[in-house]
Amino acid sequence: MHNKLFISVVVLAILLSCKDQKKEIQNTGLEEAKKAIAESNAIYFESFVKNDSSIFINRYAKDACIMAPNAVQMCGPEAAAKFFRAAYDSYGMRNGKFITTAVYGDGVEFVTEEGLWQSFNAKGELFDDGKFLVLWKKTPEGWKMFRDSFSSNRKL
């Protein structure tokens, strides 16, 4: 009887240990994703400061889609380049800021970032602001934006 109880306790301890290890791996993955997101966000708007679309395009996965308000979904690197040109040339974006409010997920393959954004013109004036959800994807090149959805806080 004591033998069965002892074996049961050992098996339970092993199972709980495995569960804790999985959670630790997931927490490590999430922390790595958060760090990569912060690094990517820190250089995202350099593309507008330098008028360099390659910086912008490199933030996105090859199969990414940008889902801007009141527009059709734009997918792929060519679409990202077109979006950059429109933001720079038509809207006059020259800088901006992301404020991440939360990152959700396990950090294994996908995580979701929630936050706020601000857009500035050549004079450094705020001309638009809003909120966003970005689904990030872990790729061989690192964490990249996979789905980028945002909307303005301004009235249409």
Where do the model's predicted regions map?
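Bacterial Sec-dependent N-terminal signal peptides
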Residues: 1-28
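Hydrophobic/aromatic beta-strand elements that line small-molecule binding cavities or substrate pockets
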Residues: 84, 98-103, 115-119, 131-137
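Short, cysteine-centered beta-strand-loop-beta hairpins and adjacent loop/turn segments enriched
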Residues: 91, 119-126
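Short beta-strand edge/turn micro-motifs at domain boundaries
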Residues: 129-154
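Short, low-complexity N-terminal intrinsically disordered segments enriched in polar/charged residues
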Residues: 18-58, 156
